[in-house]
Amino acid sequence: MVKIGNIELGEFPLLLAPMEDVSDPPFRAVCKSNGADLMYTEFISSEGLIRDAAKSVQKLDIFDYERPIGIQLFGSSIETMAECAKISTAAGPDLIDINYGCPVKQVACKGAGAALLQDIPKMVAMTKAVVEATHLPVTVKTRLGWDDSTKNIQEVAERLQDIGIKALTVHGRTRVQMYKGSADWSLIAKIKENPRINIPIFGNGDIDSPEKALEYKNTYGVDGIMIGRAAIGYPWIFNEIKHFLATGNHLNPPNLEERIKVCLQHLEFSIKWKGNHGGIVEMRRHYANYFKGLDHFKPFRSRLVTSPSFDEINVILNEVKAFYLNAEHVDA
């Protein structure tokens, strides 16, 4: 049984990665219903939260059906991060996660996210301040290092465990790599092989199929896997991996009707959370992913991303169903 503090996650948990502008409550809802064991909010700027910026505050929204769920924070100020840990604790999550892995320029160049991989003493001090600011378990997500010459994840794992984090997720690339090339899980495996390490270690990067999940589980010995981009428009990946790990057999992939059903559920959650206009606008980024692989889908997508109402979107999706099922443009 993998545990983070007192949170029981099963024998080999599958985590949904925190993704900016993606892993909001509606997206988390469809991932949870399709097998995600632990989820996180989008990462929240500590500076934005202190300023009471509306976007940052709204990211604190969590719902009981999502549990267990963590709030992920990032920032460059130790004091601000500690204060935001207190604010986040009051929002009622199951844990607090610190982002030391975001590679994007807007974050790293401000001394946050993956930038802390260049200043391990500050990373340790920041983590200690967050641990001391909350009664909740604190976890960390990071990368192998800043670049190929500074892959310091072994030191990071030991030092962060020593000051009290309860789990560590490692993306198998450096900051300089961004999302290019292949993720290197061999260094993640070395963390697990370290006799000093006793917290759960989760691997992240390039898991996009049940076969790869099984291969990486067996090869690298991690306690669980965090899935990010592969779940966008395809929340079924969690249950597909679980079924394959348990039986060695594949679940049937979702047919077109199932894709439409879950897409509409996602839209309904989005409208419920952000209102009619906001929910419809937020959903527009997801249609292409839900219907990836369909030939001739572009005209339908153009209508979906300009439609102003749920009813109209529902009509369009019914047209999608009729077009593809009747014309046999897709395996259903």
Language model regions located:
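Flavin-dependent oxidoreductase catalytic cores
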Residues: 1-332
